């Protein structure tokens, strides 16, 4: 399971012209579910995302997590993160992506785990054509994989 996390001052996702999720200060999480992922991996990744220290403390060091800065998390499904890009000029999705039904269940489970940590969470719509806008703060972007 892959999370591309970006520290943002604002982010939102629009589906069919309607905003489905929007946050101010916090993290935009693009979430990719791989073939062998399971609930245990989703739990571990949610724990890492929630606790990952990407916000500056009083000394300007990245020592604070999203909860410590009263931030929010916007989660957007992103199947292309699991693509095989090792060769050729086109990504392959057949080998590494999870079955869509499994991926959706793990995506929803991940969101529930974040919400269970009392972090405000918003989301896109699984497998929808979405327009995601953000203001990347820093920029600060990390690739987390479990």
UniProtKB/Swiss-Prot annotation:
GO terms for molecular function: D-tyrosyl-tRNA(Tyr) deacylase activity; Gly-tRNA(Ala) deacylase activity; Ser(Gly)-tRNA(Ala) hydrolase activity; tRNA binding. The keyword Ribonucleoprotein does not apply. GO terms for biological process: D-amino acid catabolic process. It catalyses: glycyl-tRNA(Ala) + H2O = tRNA(Ala) + glycine + H(+); a D-aminoacyl-tRNA + H2O = a tRNA + a D-alpha-amino acid + H(+). It comes from the Bacteria. Transmembrane segments: none annotated. An aminoacyl-tRNA editing enzyme that deacylates mischarged D-aminoacyl-tRNAs. Also deacylates mischarged glycyl-tRNA(Ala), protecting cells against glycine mischarging by AlaRS. Acts via tRNA-based rather than protein-based catalysis; rejects L-amino acids rather than detecting D-amino acids in the active site. By recycling D-aminoacyl-tRNA to D-amino acids and free tRNA molecules, this enzyme counteracts the toxicity associated with the formation of D-aminoacyl-tRNA entities in vivo and helps enforce protein L-homochirality. Homodimer. A Gly-cisPro motif from one monomer fits into the active site of the other monomer to allow specific chiral rejection of L-amino acids. This is D-aminoacyl-tRNA deacylase. It comes from Tolumonas auensis (strain DSM 9187 / NBRC 110442 / TA 4).
């Amino acid at each position: 399971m892959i999370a591309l996390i970006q520290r943002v001052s604002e982010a939102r996702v629009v589906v069919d012209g309607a905003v489905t999720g929007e946050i101010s200060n916090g993290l935009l999480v693009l979430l990719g579910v791989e073939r062998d992922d399971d609930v245990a991996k989703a739990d571990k990744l949610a724990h890492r995302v929630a606790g990952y220290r990407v916000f500056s403390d009083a000394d300007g060091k990245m020592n604070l997590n999203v909860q410590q800065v009263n931030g929010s998390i916007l989660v957007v499904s992103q199947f292309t993160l699991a693509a095989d890009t090792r060769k050729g000029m086109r990504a392959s999705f057949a080998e590494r992506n999870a079955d869509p039904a499994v991926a959706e269940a793990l995506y929803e489970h991940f969101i529930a785990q974040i919400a269970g940590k009392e972090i405000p969470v918003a989301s896109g719509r699984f497998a929808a054509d979405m327009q995601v806008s953000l203001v990347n703060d820093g920029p600060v972007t990390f690739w987390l994989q479990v």
